[in-house]
Amino acid sequence: MAAVAVAVREESRSEMKTELSPRPGAAGRELTQEEKLQLRKEKKQQKKKRKEEKGADQEIGSAVSAAQRQDPVRELQGTGSQLGGTTGEKLPAGRSKAELRAERRAKQEAERALKQARKGEQGGPSPQACPSTAGEATSGVKRVPEHTQADDPTLLRRLLRKPDRQQVPTRKDYGSKVSLFSHLPQYSRQSSLTQYMSIPSSVIHPAMVRLGLQYSQGLVSGSNARCIALLHALQQVIQDYTTPPNEELSRDLVNKLKPYISFLTQCRPMSASMCNAIKFFNKEVTGMSSSKREEEAKSELKEAIDRYVQEKIVLASQAISRFASKKISDGDVILVYGCSSLVSRILQEAWVEGRRFRVVVVDSRPRLEGRHMLHCLVRAGVPTSYLLIPAASYVLPEVSKVLLGAHALLANGSVMSRVGTAQLALVARAHNVPVLVCCETYKFCERVQTDAFVSNELDDPDDLQCKRGDQVTLANWQNNSSLRLLNLVYDVTPPELVDLVITELGMIPCSSVPVVLRVKSSDQ
């Protein structure tokens, strides 16, 4: 078939040559306009004819190759005879080239399978050797690893080496932990970080040491209060800072802050508001020009901290209070949980503006923060009721709305707040009561979390002991090997249980958190 295609091409070329040859009688005189047009038409037809012949040749070549693929034995025999004629090679009697090639391929597959089996014996099963069905799986193979990323021993050892390099004391675990939360550090007020710390020779600034102790003892609590206290401590660090010789303030100050942050984390895990404030401060420090004098740079940093507190916390809470007061009407029964400084301000300002409503304060052990909220509202003259969280379902039928604070708002719209918030939101949804969450945008974080197991905080388990007179319930619980106490600090409320989030930017749904984060990152 290839020879036929070559013959057809040669014949067509000879015909085109005869067509392109000059006509007899045309030489020696100038062509008229009609003859020129006729010649152009003939050239176009010849060009079209060449294209058609070229396409036919390609179809013939593809047909030949397809026929060869369909009958590879004949092709191999032909090539084998050609090779044998040229090189003198002789095939074994009664065996074709295709059969020899198939035999070689089978040997290669057997060798490859043997190598994979040897690798599986040395370093575990290879991906190809793993069974694809449940029937092929053996009982010795574990589908789930023994350790996840959070409780991996190598990762935990690496995290412990970091404070040692920074000369920061580490807190030891206290008591036995629940297995689901074994990857989280267990804090206790009985073990002090500063017990064996020498303040004069320590790398930690005294203001940071005092702040860490206040965090660990619970003297400073609440996201806003902890963030403001941290920023004020940073101002004291800046005031006492002196740039070493042959160093730049923008680099040395950031490195000096790292052990301070590690010490505060050992005292109590950082909140989302504190992490965002530290990111802001580091950005201000690294963006400081090296040509500025030290006193001028320190003054600008302290002014930036004051501006951050004023804009992100003070003015933001004022704007949220104005937006939230529009949702409070006369005769409302508002349920609040725990003690949120922002929610307390909203209720007191709405009462001062003339709106008349009633508040139900729900509280929970062991912190009993709702007592402080109760004291503030009663002092402002707001009619208030007080109860514990197990009785919340009995008062929800008469509640008109639930007003909650937030520890952080995650990127997937989940609300991280005091443990028990998710329970209240779930019961409120069952009674068709709207849930409103008040939160500043500086508490928005890019972390995604769907449960309270992976990332959380474990408080002192001794706080769960109940003292009644001289008797202490759960005394010496550490000696009981079958007893473990769990004192969780936060839980995660899914966005489906939250109707509205009130921020200084306005009232938004939980699904708008990624939009706010993207706008904030573009503005910065």
Curated annotation (Swiss-Prot):
GO molecular function terms noted in the UniProt entry: guanyl-nucleotide exchange factor activity; translation initiation factor activity; translation initiation factor binding
Main location: cytoplasm
Compartments where located: Cytoplasm, Cytosol
Annotated Basic and acidic residues bias: 8-20, 31-40, 96-121, 161-174
Modified residues (Phosphothreonine): T86
Regulation: Activated by the chemical integrated stress response (ISR) inhibitor ISRIB which stimulates guanine nucleotide exchange factor activity for both phosphorylated and unphosphorylated eIF2.
Keywords annotated in UniProt: Acetylation, Cytoplasm, Initiation factor, Phosphoprotein, Protein biosynthesis
Region annotated Disordered, chain positions: 1-174
Renumbered residue ranges of the record's region May bind the chemical integrated stress response (ISR) inhibitor ISRIB: 171-180
Modified residues (N-acetylalanine): A2
PTM-bearing positions, type Phosphoserine: S12
GO annotation, biological process: cytoplasmic translational initiation; hippocampus development; myelination; oligodendrocyte development; ovarian follicle development; response to glucose; response to heat; response to peptide hormone
Phosphoprotein recorded as keyword: yes
InterPro entries the record matches: IF-2B-related, IF_2B-like_C, NagB/RpiA_transferase-like
Keyword Glycoprotein part of the UniProt annotation: no
Subunit structure: Component of the translation initiation factor 2B (eIF2B) complex which is a heterodecamer of two sets of five different subunits: alpha, beta, gamma, delta and epsilon. Subunits alpha, beta and delta comprise a regulatory subcomplex and subunits epsilon and gamma comprise a catalytic subcomplex. Within the complex, the hexameric regulatory complex resides at the center, with the two heterodimeric catalytic subcomplexes bound on opposite sides.
Primary role: Acts as a component of the translation initiation factor 2B (eIF2B) complex, which catalyzes the exchange of GDP for GTP on eukaryotic initiation factor 2 (eIF2) gamma subunit. Its guanine nucleotide exchange factor activity is repressed when bound to eIF2 complex phosphorylated on the alpha subunit, thereby limiting the amount of methionyl-initiator methionine tRNA available to the ribosome and consequently global translation is repressed.
The protein's name in its UniProt record: Translation initiation factor eIF2B subunit delta
Organism: Rattus norvegicus (Rat)
